Regions:
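Catalytic, metal-anchored helix/loop core of enzyme active sites in primary metabolism
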Residues: 1-425
Length: 425
């Protein structure tokens, strides 16, 4: 596939935002909203908070459809504000809360935006899944919050807008994704004493990938795999969508785009290395040839704790790493012939013109279709490639509204393509 390339690379590392200032660093308790508390990241964040007595005040929790779990979380942490995705869930949630506990409850994306911009909240953990997290993330940025960002799609879709909004509002981004958090930790020396680390002497970022459940297999072997096999990730416990993205390597493609926006380096300076043990989470190569790596167990509580506690490190009960017991670590280059989604993501980012929006929307719809057994494993990459080929827009979306309009337009087109394919077979 050939996509017209319009973007020019940026020459040096330039972090997306200023870093949190002294007032935030010294705030006790640190006030927090968690958007997506019932998902994998949200649940892990609450595990971290349980060990931090007096250090945080959980002001707001928001979940999507698991209302009983949200009610259980709310009963334990007693936030003043709750959010649900559907208006119809408010009554159910209210009925499950303890007698005498009456928080405010908001609904829908507008409700999530409200919780992201509460006056008394300093920190927002953005942990919604997919493009659905963009509006609330962007609202938090415009409100000048410190955002612990787990919703990578916000940067994939609107990285340039978010960078500009951070500059205007003073918002700060701290990356929760394990790979980008690892890079952030490796850059700690470059960040020291600077609120705006624009010019770290970095030559390369190396994102590690587990390879997913199908590492080492060829295309013929993968033609007939189904959701059950693709969901069997060897190392990480994650939600269904991101687990499928790991199997196709689309997750790593999205992370390349995320890294480009977070760290400002050109795509040519962002590489992927398959490391099936998931112990080294990423590496930074400096201009003198040295490389720094961050190692740890494959457990999201570590990067979550690093973001919530920054610049301090929080206590966690994650099992400690025993390198002697591991014995050895392995590395390989990704097989981009067998896993074409990785290159599709690179092409989309290089092309611009809203192509990353199309890439993400088509992938989300294709993954849903694969999980429903409406398309095969390679149907995911085929659907994404076809959506990119059909995209004719010649300019970048100029606002969040334009981005989400393109997102919806792409989804409608992709659903029609998937339905037409099913009707033919």
């Amino acid at each position: 596939m050939t996509i017209e390339r319009l973007q020019q690379p940026q020459p040096r590392l330039r972090y997306i935002s200023a870093l949190p200032g002294r007032a935030w660093q010294e705030q006790r308790p640190r006030t927090l909203s968690i958007l997506g508390s019932t998902g994998t990241i949200g649940r892990s964040a609450l595990e971290v908070l349980r060990l931090q007595e007096g250090r945080f005040h959980l002001t707001a929790l928001a979940g999507a459809r698991n209302i009983p779990l949200l009610a259980k979380q709310a009963a334990e942490f007693r936030p003043e504000h709750l959010g649900v995705l559907e208006e119809s869930s408010i009554a159910e949630l209210r009925s499950l809360l303890p007698v005498g506990y009456a928080p405010s409850i908001v609904a829908g994306q507008q409700g999530f935006e409200t919780l992201a911009t509460l006056t008394g909240v300093s920190t927002v953990l953005s942990a919604q899944v997919g493009a659905a997290g963009l509006r609330a993330t962007f609202a938090a940025v415009r409100a000048g919050k410190v955002i612990a960002l787990a919703n990578k799609e916000s940067l994939v879709l609107a990285g340039d807008l978010i960078r500009a909004a951070c500059s205007e509002s003073g918002a700060c981004i701290l990356p929760v994704d394990s790979e980008h958090n690892a890079i952030f930790q490796c850059l700690a020396g470059s960040f020291a004493g600077s609120s705006a680390p624009w010019d770290a002497d970095v030559s390369r970022l190396i994102l590690t990938a587990s390879g997913g459940p199908f590492f080492g297999q060829n295309r013929d072997a993968l033609q007939t795999v189904g959701p059950d096999q693709a969901l069997a990730h060897p190392n990480w416990i994650m939600g269904a969508k991101i687990t499928i993205d790991s199997a196709t390597l689309m997750n790593k493609g999205l992370e390349i785009i995320e890294a480009r926006h977070l760290y400002g380096l050109p795509l040519s300076a962002i590489e992927v290395l398959v490391h099936k043990e998931s112990i080294i989470h990423s590496l930074v190569e400096y201009t003198d040839g040295s490389q720094l790596a961050q190692l740890g167990q494959p457990d999201m509580r570590v990067p979550i704790a690093y973001c919530l506690g920054w610049p301090d490190r929080l206590q966690t009960d994650v099992p400690r790493l025993d390198l002697a017991a591991l014995g050895s670590l392995s590395f390989a280059r990704p097989d981009e012939q067998t896993f074409p989604c990785l290159d599709l993501a690179r092409q989309a980012q290089e092309a611009g013109r809203g192509c990353p929006v199309v890439l993400n929307a088509a992938n989300e719809e294709a993954v849903a279709a694969f999980l429903d057994r409406r398309i095969g494993f390679y149907g995911i990459a085929d659907v994404v490639a076809e959506a990119l080929e059909a995209h004719t827009q010649t300019s970048e979306p100029a606002s969040v509204d334009e981005i989400l309009a393109l997102d919806q337009e792409t989804r409608a087109r992709v659903r029609s393509v998937i339905d037409a394919h099913r009707n033919r077979t």
